[in-house]
Structure formats: C-alpha cells, structure tokens
Amino acid sequence: MKKDLRAHCHTIIAGNHEQSPAEHFYAMAKWCEEHQVKHDVYGDGEFINSFQQKVADLLGFEAGLFVITGTMTQATALELVCRKKRNPVVAMHESSHIYRFERQGYQLQNRFSILPLGDMFRPWTAKDLNAWPDEISAVLYELPMRELGGQLPSWDELNDIKAECEHRDIHLHMDGARLWECAAYYQKSYKEIATGFQSAYVSLYKGINGLGGSLLLGDKKFIEQASIWMKRQGGNVYHRTPYVVSAAMQFDQQLAKMPALFARTQQIYQILREFPQLAVSPYEPQANMLHLIVPLSLENAIELRDRLAEQKGVWLGHPQTTQHPEQSIFEWYVGDRLLNIADDQLREVLAYLANAEC
C-alpha cells in the first residue's frame, strides 16, 4: 500500500471524519472543563463509574467495566465462564475476531477451546448450535457480523438462540463491537437486543469515534471477577480518563446518528442497483455497513484503488480477497462521510469501478 495516497485524497468514502490529535485533544479539554471531569485512579472515580453505569443501564446490565482493549475483554469474559463451569468449551462463528484475528491467543494461552458454528457465509442459528452434541460453557454472537458485511440474524432467529442457550444453560455472550449499528435494522432498543445475553462487550471507538477502549457488561459479581482478572493481565491502567472522556463526549451524539446512517445505507443500496457490474453483501442492508463486491482480482483492485486516488483524489479503502480469484470486496462503513457525499459524486465513483479495465 502507498501510505501517502490516502492522505492526499480529498474524499474518503468509508467511516467517519477523523479529527487531528490537536483538534480531538482540544475538544476533550473543553468538554472536561465544562463537565468538571476529574481523573479516575486505577479505574475508580465518579466520572468513569457514572459512564460505565450509563452504558450498563442502556443495555439492561447491572454493571460495566472499562477495559483497555476488546481483545482482553472478550477472551477474559469467556475464560471466566469456563472456569466457573469447569468446562473449557466455547462456540462461535468462524469469522469471529477471537477465532481469526487474535493470533490464536486463546489456544496458546490455554484459555478455552472453540467449536465453529454454522456456515462460513451466514449468521448461525439455534439449529447450528444444536448440531454440536458437546457440553458447551459459553457461546459468542457478534451483532452485527463484520466479516459478513454486517449481516444479522432475524429477530426471531436471535430470540430462538437466546431461548436455546437458556434451555441448555449456556452462557450467551455478545460481541457488540458494532452493536450500536444494528438497532435501526431491528427497530428495537439496545436493552431489548441485549436481553437474554449474560454478558456483552461494546467498543468505545468504532461507531462512537473514541480514542480506544471497550466496556464489559454483566452482573455485578461477574464484573467484579473480571476486574480482578484484568489487573492480573496488566490491564490496570492508572488513568482511564482520556479514553472515557473521548467516548463519553460523543456517545449520545453518535448513537443519535445511527438511524440516519442506516437510512443513508438504504439509499446507497438503491444507487448500487444502477450498476449491475457490482454486487453487494448482504443483499439488503442490515446495518450501516456493507461489502462492495467488484469483479477484480485483489491485485487489480489495489491497482484500481491507487489509480482512483491519484487521478480523482478519492480513497476507496482496502480491498480483500474472496473465494473467487477474480473478485474482491471493499468494506464500507457508512459514516458521516458517506452521509454527506452527494449522490452524483457517489455515482461517479461507482461508474469508475463498474467500468474499470485492469
């Protein structure tokens, strides 16, 4: 990748506008002054406690805990369940972050074993869970599923999974890295979506635009145990204030945008129908994100992206391979950039893609 190309583009297609460090830190300082924010000390303080509880209440959990990374959050949560049940078996879709993108930490650290659920290209169902006869301590469900373009189970399918886990006494954990993005599709509150999950992880930087960090949510006893285990892993950061302020000052504003971002995604799908050379996954929008499928090999897609950046000043993103050698996908998160781009400008970009010759 030519790292300087993106920086010289006037139009970035996916995601939200990124402030410079100076802009972001200035906004944080101003917000801290207006709200008289005081530092936490090793995670204890009025401001951080209030924010943790605010998010816990929003999702219907008893308590919340700031954790510096989602990688630490989720593996620890699942390991705690396995320890309690004295059974190291968990289940999840094979596209899950733990399974694919965490350097097999769960294996090398002997934390738990993973049974893959369902079809690689579809959200898994209660039927897929029942295909495993094993005794399972916990299952993880990612809502929505990023590697599938933001696909979600139907509301009935999700409720069937909740009921099946309750029936089999399986701890149901939510990977809610992009939970904020799915309420508009379900037309349900976050609390309704989270009901039936015993624990959840949410990101403070993806849809929220914060500097980083995450929250683990669950009952008070579970969160107290998790807090101890985060300390044992080196996660006991002295001041968490910067991360929490960065998220808290944007939290309500970003959640309020989600319906408009989903509506914009629906509009983009209609525009995409004008270009039959291009495909999109999922077939209908289920969150404010999508996989744009182009009829190009990865190498040709990269070449096209760089040419568009050089000639037009437009950055498409990072293409990925598919099962087909002459297909690639661009993941587009529909944030304020696509919300504000003119339809005709978007059509020009799509026409460039549709008529590309590499």
Kindly give the residue locations of the regions a language model identified.
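PLP-dependent aminotransferase-like
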Residues: C82-Y141
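Active-site C-terminal subdomain of aminotransferase-like
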Residues: E147, L152, T195-P276, S281-A287, ...
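N-terminal "arm"/small-domain region of PLP-dependent enzymes with the aminotransferase-like
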Residues: M1-Y42, A56-L59, E331-N340, D344, ...
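Active-site phosphate-binding strand-loop segment of PLP-dependent enzymes
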Residues: R122-G176
